[in-house]
């Protein structure tokens, strides 16, 4: 195969995304047909999902859509970055975003708009579910970007961190978020030394003090034996131990962890924290959360399925219209507690809901091409998502509609 002549890797450049080159070809056909017919209708488009696990998710990617559409002839309303959105079995959905634009101009940007929202939201939603499964007292670290396309690593880690993980391992993502990367040591380091104790002692000698001494304890011997060896090698400098045993040979992980905790404690190692990684999902986390201090979660979150958002016209030149199976007209979403009501925008019902304590979820993002929303810092987003998830986990939730 011949080399690419303008890039090293099979990835889109930022300017190519902005120009709509990552679109599907039938949108180019559509644009050409509209230009031929001298048509460019003003449309309202809504982005929504119908089927999401447990009927809720975290919407993320709003910031990137704003950067994509900034300066264009568009008006955009959207939920807040990190907001919880709801779905139901009803055909009446709640949009997470609403775009008013000339269709010939916006059509080729459907792919990147959906891509930004679907990918980030899918990862954030999975990370939020894992956070809820773990509870507030257990640490969660993201270790999964090695199995994702490297160009996507910052997006993946941002979504995971905002959704409630305590740290991420990817270096570039950490730099972009202005946080310290977190990590332990790989099996490869221990194999390179050929002796666990030599590797642990070298790690302790080489690493600056702010790097926690977490010994990997399942490379060559039984986990209990290596845990005792690590404590003997590093003593009070040993912050924690990590078990990364594959599920194919780990046995009953809870019993292994409890055995290690006992053996460390009777040797004055009660200070040593226990971390588990390797093939973890919500079920395993629930089973272990009361006996471990933290989890390293990889592929189950970094390779999360995207949210299946749709991008549908609901109004053309001010006239409500929609394809079969969708519902026409610009909509507003109002929330009180986590009971959401969908209605037509600018209607008497909308005004009634606002007057009776319901919060509008679709807010101005772009007005006449200008971004009018001030985006929050990543740390503030994390705090907001944490607060919302805590409230949500204790509340009933529903979606209904009213006209």
Where is each model-derived feature located?
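Ordered alpha/beta subdomains of enzyme catalytic regions
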Residues: 1-211, 237, 310-403
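Glycine-rich phosphate/ribose-binding loops and adjacent secondary-structure elements
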Residues: 3, 184, 188-345
């Amino acid at each position: 195969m011949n080399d690419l002549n303008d890039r090293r890797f099979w990835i889109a450049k930022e300017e190519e995304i902005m120009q709509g080159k990552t679109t599907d070809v039938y949108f180019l056909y559509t644009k050409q047909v509209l230009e031929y017919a001298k048509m460019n209708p003003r449309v309202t488009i809504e982005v929504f999902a119908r089927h999401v696990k447990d009927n809720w998710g975290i919407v993320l990617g709003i910031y990137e859509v704003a950067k994509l559409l900034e300066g264009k002839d568009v008006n955009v309303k959207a939920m807040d970055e990190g907001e919880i959105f709801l779905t139901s079995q009803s055909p009446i959905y709640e949009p997470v975003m609403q775009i008013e634009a000339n269709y010939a101009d916006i059509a080729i940007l459907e792919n990147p708009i959906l891509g930004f929202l679907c990918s980030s939201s899918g990862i954030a939603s999975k990370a939020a579910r894992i956070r809820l499964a773990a509870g507030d007292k257990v640490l969660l670290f993201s270790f999964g970007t090695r199995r994702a396309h490297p160009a996507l690593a910052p997006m993946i880690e941002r979504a995971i961190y905002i959704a409630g993980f305590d740290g991420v391992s990817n270096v570039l993502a950490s730099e972009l978020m202005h946080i310290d990367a977190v990590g332990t040591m790989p099996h490869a380091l221990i194999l390179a030394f050929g002796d666990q104790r030599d590797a642990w002692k070298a790690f302790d000698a080489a690493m600056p003090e702010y790097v926690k001494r977490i010994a990997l304890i399942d490379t060559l011997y039984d986990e209990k034996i290596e845990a005792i060896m690590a404590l003997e090698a590093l003593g009070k400098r040993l912050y924690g131990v990590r078990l990364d045993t594959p599920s194919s040979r780990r046995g009953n992980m809870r019993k292994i962890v409890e055995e290690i905790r006992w053996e460390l404690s009777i040797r004055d190692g009660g200070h040593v924290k226990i971390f588990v990684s390797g093939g973890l999902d919500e079920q395993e986390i629930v089973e272990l959360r009361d006996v471990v201090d933290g989890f390293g979660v990889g592929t189950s979150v970094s390779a999360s399925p995207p949210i299946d958002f749709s991008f549908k016209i609901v109004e053309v030149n001010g006239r409500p219209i929609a394809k079969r199976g969708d519902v026409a007209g610009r909509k507003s979403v109002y929330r009180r507690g986590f009971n959401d009501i969908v209605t037509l925008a600018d209607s008497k019902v909308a005004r009634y809901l606002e007057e009776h304590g319901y919060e509008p979820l679709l807010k101005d993002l772009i007005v006449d091409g200008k971004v009018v929303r001030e985006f929050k810092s990543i740390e503030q987003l994390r705090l907001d998502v944490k607060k919302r998830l805590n409230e949500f986990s204790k509340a009933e939730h529903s979606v209904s509609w009213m006209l």
